């Protein structure tokens, strides 16, 4: 017996970006000189960032048309409204979620951002928490 449902659409796309993790160049936890050394992340390096964005929809008849949604998100980067440079996957996700939340309010948003389709972040943004408040809580923790 089904007692309720929550529906999502999802889109995937890729964008090229250059970024760096400045702390990696000098933080002893990152610049270890051992097998786990990641100090190379402190210099600019290129990635193809892979996105998977899920958006809650309110009905099953193209509440949000996913091809249009995908193009809308791609254009944010292609028209330089958003940039990937020098941001972590989590930062990229938060910035994208702010835009989506403003355009499509009161919907759950799920975003995956991966470097080269290999490693990345996955974040769920729930409409019951104001996005800016949630991000401030995380940054202040």
Per-segment meaning from a language model:
Residues 1-141:
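Charge-rich, low-complexity N-terminal segments
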